[in-house]
């Protein structure tokens, strides 16, 4: 029997305050999302009452929101929230436990983090009229202490997120390699790592590879120079195995991935390792890969008739409304540790030469609705949304259905960033669709 699986999705939900009482666009957005039986997004904050210990690190800003904000998030109709992102461990193990507890209270399916690596990498299972759908969530942007660890027969696992590690390699000419070697010699930049390598604490360098400041360089054989990246084979295998296992009992598998990495010097191109990972997921049997992270849209690829959304951008982006920040943040920006969070955020804005809040693309996104039959995408449409860049402060940073002029700009931009994947987009009758 050929069953049709209906999925709708949104990007990153960084919610810090309640939705406005008079906010009406929740209704048409909810109506669009409710077409899907699986309705998914990334929850890019912890949920707590603010009493959890802050980690010594954060995903950029320490984020935690009240449970009432989670209630408002669910007004859009989401029944799955990914929790694997660079803010998962902003408030340490206690913050993660609080987030999971609140999601369970609301009976919301989640994946991407847990008490150990098994739980963090385990898919959520959603029941639909087409059968059970598995959703895996994974993240490539994190402090190493944030990743979940495996349990053994001797020790418990470590709470954290489901990690997608990756390696980078820089290819340079022989002349540039000699220059780096000379700089390393006179500065001692590699001294400690060289010593640790001799003592066996760091693995030996592969043949033909040199290190400089923790980065790996390979001498080019043909004179070309550049950067490449590849996903960690252990993390790829764990994910591929989870996809294949889920396919044994589920009608479809979806993979959500959170990644802030970039290919060169802008947020428009997916990193090399992310493309390789997404393709591996589809090759293993996943029906779609849904990405987030870089706060603006990336390209959409149809790979083997399955959609890959490399980044859906923002759905709610209220980073400037953070209500609590630890002393670590204030010290970083030269402020008294008792300074109010709003002043701390303002200080960071003052130091920025290219603020996210001044970039139109940060305020524009799409919500995909797609249908899957026999593992392939048979229908795909996008609802263009904007986050109120030109509205009053109280109305900013939450989604509104885009007007025709803005929607056409979104379609044009999406075509530009999707060019490498051969997909073109046009705005037609309130939706963005593939150009015929």
Q: Locations of the language-model features?
A:
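Acidic, metal/ion-coordinating pockets
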Residues: 1-436
């Amino acid at each position: 029997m050929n069953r049709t699986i209906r999925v709708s999705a949104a990007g990153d939900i960084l919610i810090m305050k309640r939705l406005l009482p008079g906010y009406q666009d929740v209704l048409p957005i909810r109506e669009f999302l409710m077409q899907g039986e699986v309705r998914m997004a990334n929850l890019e904050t912890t949920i707590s009452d603010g009493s959890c210990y802050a980690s010594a690190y954060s995903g950029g800003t320490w984020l935690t929101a009240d449970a009432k904000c989670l209630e408002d998030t669910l007004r859009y109709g989401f029944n799955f929230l990914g929790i694997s992102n660079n803010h998962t461990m902003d408030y340490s193990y206690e913050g993660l436990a609080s987030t999971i507890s609140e999601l369970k209270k609301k009976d919301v399916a989640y994946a991407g983090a847990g008490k150990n690596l098994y739980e963090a990498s385990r898919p959520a299972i959603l029941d639909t009229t087409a059968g059970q759908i598995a959703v895996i969530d994974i993240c490539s942007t994190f402090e190493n202490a944030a990743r979940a660890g495996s349990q053994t027969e001797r020790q418990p696992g470590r709470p954290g997120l489901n990690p997608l590690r990756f390696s980078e390699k820089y290819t340079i000419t022989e002349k540039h390699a000699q220059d780096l070697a000379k700089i390393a010699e006179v500065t001692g930049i590699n001294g400690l790592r060289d010593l640790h390598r001799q003592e066996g604490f760091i693995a030996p360098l592969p043949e033909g590879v040199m290190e400089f400041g923790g980065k790996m360089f390979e001498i080019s054989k043909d004179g070309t120079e550049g950067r490449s990246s590849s996903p960690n084979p252990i993390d790829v295998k764990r994910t591929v195995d989870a996809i294949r296992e889920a396919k044994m009992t589920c009608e479809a598998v979806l993979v959500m991935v959170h990644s802030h990495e970039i290919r060169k010097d802008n947020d428009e191109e997916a990193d090399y390792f992310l493309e390789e990972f997404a393709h591996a997921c589809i090759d293993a049997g996943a029906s779609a890969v849904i990405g987030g992270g870089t706060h603006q849209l990336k390209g959409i690829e149809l790979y083997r008739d399955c959609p890959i959304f490399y980044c859906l951008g923002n759905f709610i982006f209220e980073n400037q409304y953070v209500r609590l920040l630890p002393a670590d943040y204030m010290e970083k920006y030269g402020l008294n540790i008792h300074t109010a969070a709003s002043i701390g955020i303002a200080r960071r804005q003052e130091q920025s030469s290219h603020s996210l809040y001044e970039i139109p693309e940060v305020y524009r996104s799409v919500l995909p609705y797609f249908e899957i039959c026999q593992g392939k995408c048979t229908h795909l449409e996008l609802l263009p949304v904007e986050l109120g860049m030109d509205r009053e402060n109280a109305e900013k940073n939450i989604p509104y259905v885009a007007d025709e002029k803005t929607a056409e700009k979104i379609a044009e931009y999406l075509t530009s960033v999707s060019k490498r994947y051969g997909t073109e987009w046009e705005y037609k009758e309130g939706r963005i669709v593939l150009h015929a």
